[in-house]
Amino acid sequence: MKKISLLGSTGSIGVNTLDVVDRNPESFQILAMSAGSNVELFAEQVRKFKPKVASLYDITKIAALKERVADLDVEIIPGEEGSIAVATLPEADVIVSGIVGSAGLVPAIVALKAGKILPWQIKKL
């Protein structure tokens, strides 16, 4: 089973990745996930996939996220620190990054420096 850390779970790459994981639970597990600011969708995803670590980049919405997942055993880490934690989680086999543009650079670089597999995906050429 491949253990996945997912950066940008609420965008199209993230949503499609979660769809693949959902259809193949014997092959994949989400260990950690992050999102930008869509707290409603992200809370639903956290409730469904039950990661060990969840990160919301928009620190003004952390309280709302914590409230929505208070009954779950999930560590919530805000902001860029959280994205880095998701990208470098030791137990993760693969880091899937759906973060658009330069915002995804730091998590991608730290994931690679940590020796993680980081599949390359391009939405638009």
Could you say what each language-model-derived stretch is?
Residues 1-102:
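N-terminal glycine-/serine-/threonine-rich beta1-alpha1-beta2 phosphate-ribose binding loop
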Residues 96-99, 112, 116-125:
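ADP-ribose/adenylate-binding Rossmann-like module
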Residues 106-110:
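Hydrophobic alpha-helical segments in the ANL/AMP-binding
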